Regions:
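C-terminal motif of bacterial Sec signal peptides marking the signal peptidase cleavage site
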Residues: 6-9
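Immediate post-signal-peptide N-terminus of mature secreted/exported proteins
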Residues: 12-64
Length: 149
């Protein structure tokens, strides 16, 4: 989590150019790739609380179903399966973000531009998949919880 704080604290997504400070506009392919990687990271971090809240809501819904009479549980079995799947999706999204943050090395191959470009291209793809997992799992869980039964 400390790495996440550093990423968020050190990355300014604004494009203003203050006197004496360099502009945040990407100037090279490396800069552009790093900006795209950080954008993916920021989307993930901005949804971390929502992931946590949604996990709690899905768990509460599953707990509520488990307390119903057997006949009602049987009627809600297909919905419970969907909720279980949504819970797994949310858990995976959290896991994927944590794993990506642990493994990401902001300074990887700084002295070898070709290796750096390849590394950042790969990381852009990875963080894109993480972002997709986060957004899709949140949308799925949200639509299930809003469903009228």
């Amino acid at each position: 989590m400390a790495a996440a704080f550093v990423f968020v604290a050190c990355h300014n997504s604004g494009k203003e150019d203050h006197t004496g400070h360099p502009s945040n506009e990407p100037k090279t392919q490396e800069d552009s790739l790093m900006a795209e990687v950080m954008d993916g990271h920021e989307v993930g971090m901005s949804k971390s609380k929502k992931l946590e809240d949604m996990q709690a809501k899905v768990k509460a819904a599953l707990d509520s179903i488990s307390k119903l009479p057997a006949k009602a549980q049987q009627q809600l079995a297909p919905y419970k399966i969907q909720l279980d799947s949504a819970a797994s999706g949310l858990s995976y999204a959290v896991y994927a973000m944590d794993k990506w943050m642990e493994e990401f090395n902001m300074d990887s191959a700084k002295d070898n531009i070709e290796a750096r470009i390849k590394y950042l291209t790969d990381e852009k793809m990875k963080v894109g998949k993480v972002k997709e997992a986060i957004l899709n799992s949140l949308a799925t869980a949200d639509s299930l919880l809003r469903a009228k039964l």
